[in-house]
């Protein structure tokens, strides 16, 4: 199968995207892969697979590689001797802004390029944590209570301590702080507001169980990964999550009851259905006294959560063959022709 991995982007998670792409190069060695890098200036480069290493990007070596443009149906490499289409379904692996906020989805849709990843509407609901909670309420999925703050409401906290403070539109624990009392609040808010103009405050739930579940739908059927119980620490900071994005070995399935497994899958389906088709996503859940709460949606999970699937390559092939088709207007110019005919022109 031909697959084009699109990575990079102009976001705070740019480097994580590079790590994910390098990881998938090894994981998908039986695929016919192309690699397209989007730099911070939104220029696209075709990266030779042999150059897929971190220093290619940190040293700026990618700038010596072919630049790409977009045309109907594909990315294009132009040269003095003509142009070459970069064929294959695109895998959107740009984490954070650009990739998860709907920007790349809109561009790929505009040029009718087939891709695996969240569509524009799905991106809107998963990228902004405020809208994720609205989605949960609309679909009957429980989520943790929260308070939204703008920079003008700097310390009007109504939730009891300890709390967790996070930017509305960032992942990978960037700008996230646990605040155990009011003395640490201003610093946490200042840190979060460095990355966004809106902040979400939630109660910090201690002693809860956490579970991660990835999946997708294809042919009106859901396909799920194993359920992972992530390593138990009070808080995974950016560096720990950065290392987590390079995972490629499979993990052990959580030891949970069939009842809880069914609850987690049911919540996943409610979130996914009629919104995330075409994407492989990961949902992170809290379980409190047997009740399931959605913590967050990862529309483009680190390294595509490959380590949660027994047959990750097979899952991607299945998804690539079941991508949604957008109905497009057929332009016929009938109206203009009828007016011209009536005027005798």
Swiss-Prot record:
Q: Which residues form the ATP-grasp domain?
A: 133-332
Identify the metabolic or biological route this protein is part of.
Answer: Cell wall biogenesis; peptidoglycan biosynthesis
- A single Gene Ontology CC term: cytoplasm
What protein name does the entry list? D-alanine--D-alanine ligase
Record keywords: rRNA processing included?
no
Q: Where is the signal peptide?
A: none
Q: Which GO terms describe its molecular function?
A: ATP binding; D-alanine-D-alanine ligase activity; metal ion binding
EC number(s) given by UniProt: 6.3.2.4
Show the taxonomic lineage: Bacteria, Pseudomonadati, Campylobacterota, Epsilonproteobacteria, Campylobacterales
Cofactor: how and how many bound:
Binds 2 magnesium or manganese ions per subunit.
Pfam families to which the protein is assigned, alphabetical: Dala_Dala_lig_C, Dala_Dala_lig_N
Q: What does this protein do?
A: Cell wall formation.
Q: Which Gene3D superfamilies match?
A: 3.40.50.20, ATP-grasp fold, A domain (3.30.1490.20), ATP-grasp fold, B domain (3.30.470.20)
Provide the protein's localization.
Cytoplasm
What does the record list as GO biological process? cell wall organization; peptidoglycan biosynthetic process; regulation of cell shape
Q: Does the keyword Cytoplasm apply?
A: yes
Q: Which UniProt keywords apply?
A: ATP-binding, Cell shape, Cell wall biogenesis/degradation, Cytoplasm, Ligase, Magnesium, Manganese, Metal-binding, Nucleotide-binding, Peptidoglycan synthesis
Q: Where does Mg(2+) 1 bind?
A: 284, 296
Q: Which co-factors does it depend on? A: Mg(2+); Mn(2+)
Positions annotated to bind Mg(2+) 2: 296, 298
**Classification via SUPFAM superfamilies:** Glutathione synthetase ATP-binding domain-like (SSF56059), PreATP-grasp domain (SSF52440)
Its top-level enzyme class, in one word, is ligase
Catalysed reaction(s)? 2 D-alanine + ATP = D-alanyl-D-alanine + ADP + phosphate + H(+)
């Amino acid at each position: 199968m031909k697959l084009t991995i699109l990575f990079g982007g102009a976001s705070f998670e740019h480097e994580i995207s590079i790590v994910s792409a390098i990881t998938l190069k090894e994981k998908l060695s039986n695929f016919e892969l192309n690699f397209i890098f989007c730099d911070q200036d939104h220029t696209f480069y075709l990266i030779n697979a042999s150059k897929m290493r971190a220093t290619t990007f940190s040293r700026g070596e990618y700038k010596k590689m072919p630049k790409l443009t977009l045309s109907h149906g594909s990315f294009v490499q132009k040269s003095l001797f003509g142009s070459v289409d970069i064929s294959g379904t695109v895998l959107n692996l740009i984490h954070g802004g650009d990739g998860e906020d709907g920007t790349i989805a809109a561009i790929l849709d505009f040029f009718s390029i087939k891709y695996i990843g969240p569509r524009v509407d799905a991106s809107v609901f998963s990228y902004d944590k405020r809208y994720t909670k609205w989605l949960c309420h609309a679909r009957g999925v429980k989520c943790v209570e929260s308070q939204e703050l703008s920079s003008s409401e700097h310390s009007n906290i109504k939730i009891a301590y300890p709390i967790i403070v996070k930017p509305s539109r960032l992942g990978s624990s960037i700008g996230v702080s646990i605040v155990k009392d009011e003395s640490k609040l201003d610093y946490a808010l200042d840190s979060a507001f460095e990355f966004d103009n809106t902040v979400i405050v939630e109660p910090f739930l201690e002693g809860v169980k956490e579970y991660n579940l990835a999946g997708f739908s294809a042919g009106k059927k859901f396909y799920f990964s194993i359920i992972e119980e992530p390593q138990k620490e009070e808080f995974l900071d950016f560096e720990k999550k950065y290392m987590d994005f390079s995972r490629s070995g499979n993990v052990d399935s959580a030891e949970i009851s069939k009842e809880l497994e069914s609850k987690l899958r049911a919540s996943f389906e409610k979130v996914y259905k009629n919104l995330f088709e075409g994407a492989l996503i990961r949902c992170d859940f809290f379980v409190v006294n047997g009740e399931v709460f959605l913590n967050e949606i990862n529309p483009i999970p680190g390294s595509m959560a490959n380590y949660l699937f027994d047959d990750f390559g097979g899952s991607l092939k299945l998804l690539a063959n079941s991508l949604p088709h957008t109905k497009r207007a057929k332009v016929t110019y009938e109206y203009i022709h009828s007016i011209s005919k009536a005027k005798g022109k």
